[in-house]
A protein has these predicted regions:
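Short, Lys/Arg-rich flexible segments
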Residues: 1-84, 92-93, 98-143
Length: 143
């Protein structure tokens, strides 16, 4: 699975430090807002690359696209909150969605790479930051 790490600007950190005991619930809401933006871009990129440029008729079932989703916000072992865009496992045929996504992203012998995760990460970066900033401002305004 692809890993993306985004650093928060100083004004974010100042707002977050003012939240006090409400930090966890606000962090979940803010991460969810940013994750939805990235998820939407990854889904559109995945839809555009599946079945494109193949020698034979595509056998796509839509199961990979349907398995794409957002994890709940959790605290990792370093004490940072994170949220992940990824694939639900396993497939109905017993295979791995992550394996298929990896093959599509990086290719294999005889099958060229059709990246969809990395372009989504770079394309949605600013939109994600904007959505998270807006969500943070709304949550701080509620308190």
């Amino acid at each position: 699975m692809a890993k993306a790490e985004m650093k928060m600007p100083e004004d974010f950190l100042l707002k977050i430090s003012k939240l006090g005991s409400y930090f966890d619930s606000v962090a979940d809401t803010v991460l969810q807002a940013g994750g939805e933006v990235v998820l939407k871009k990854v889904k559109s990129n995945l839809s555009s690359v599946i079945g494109r440029g193949t020698k034979f008729k595509s056998r796509a079932t839509g199961e990979l696209e349907g398995a794409l989703g957002l994890s709940p916000s959790k605290m990792n072992r370093d004490g940072n909150h994170d949220i992940k865009v990824g694939f639900a496992e396993p497939r109905s045929d017993g295979g791995s969605n992550a394996k298929l996504a990896n093959i599509i992203e990086y290719g294999k012998h005889g099958q060229p790479a059709k990246p969809f995760l990395k372009p989504a990460k770079t394309a949605s970066r600013q939109e994600c930051i904007d959505a998270m900033t807006k969500a943070l401002d709304e949550e701080v305004g509620k308190l």
